[in-house]
A protein has these predicted regions:
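Short, solvent-exposed amphipathic alpha-helical segments in soluble enzyme
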Residues: 20, 69-71, 122-123, 144
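Conserved core of the sugar-phosphate nucleotidyltransferase
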Residues: 113-182
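Glycine-rich, flexible loop/turn motifs
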Residues: 10-13, 21-24, 78, 90, ...
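Conserved N-terminal catalytic core of the sugar/cofactor nucleotidyltransferase
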Residues: 2-8, 13, 19, 26-27, ...
Length: 182
């Protein structure tokens, strides 16, 4: 199992905090956000993590790279660093880690701090984790059918579609399927 963490954004909404440290490395209760994120995911997966691939901006520097690799190693995984030096969207960020896009993987955006109970159906081809929210118009939301399958995904709906907000964590039984679509 792999975890892919796109985190090259500049964190402009959290300035001045992000002037000296990338947003995913801001400590919360003594640990960087990204560290908490990968620990939570590893706990849910209940299987060894082979690799954690971090997609960062080159300007983050060598110290950040070393810190990220150390986070991966604490979980018994290989830490890999990829670069996204131009903001060309989330699909592009994922493709920056194309050499790691094979086999089962979780893609997790490190720009949202959320505490949630995760569950993984490893028989599913893919999973999008969601959380019930009070203001769905502020988020991307999913609409489910009776079998709990996603039938619609709407970004910041003007009218009510659902109160299940996408939290930025996705599982793929074979992430190469996503790679081929990007």
């Amino acid at each position: 199992m792999k975890i892919i963490v796109p985190m090259a954004g500049r964190g402009s909404r959290l300035r001045p905090h992000t002037l000296t440290i990338p947003k995913p490395l801001i400590p919360v209760a003594g640990k960087p956000i990204v560290h908490r994120l990968v620990e939570d995911i590893a706990g849910v997966l209940n299987q060894p993590i082979e690799e954690i691939a971090f997609v960062i901006h080159e300007s983050f520097g060598k110290k950040v790279e070393e810190d990220l690799i150390a986070i991966a190693e604490k979980l018994g995984a290989k830490g890999t660093i990829y670069y996204q030096n131009e903001a060309l969207g989330t699909g592009h960020a994922i493709m920056c880690a194309k050499d790691s896009l094979s086999g089962p993987a979780v893609i997790a955006y490190a720009d949202t701090l959320i505490r949630a109970d995760f569950d993984l159906d490893q028989n599913a081809d893919s999973v999008i984790w969601v959380k019930q929210v009070d203001q769905p118009e502020a988020f991307g939301v999913v609409k489910l059918n009776e079998a709990n399958e996603i039938v619609e995904l709407v970004e910041k709906p003007a009218t009510f579609v659902s109160d299940l907000a996408v939290i930025g964590i996705y599982y793929f039984k074979d992430v190469a399927v996503l790679k081929n679509e990007l």
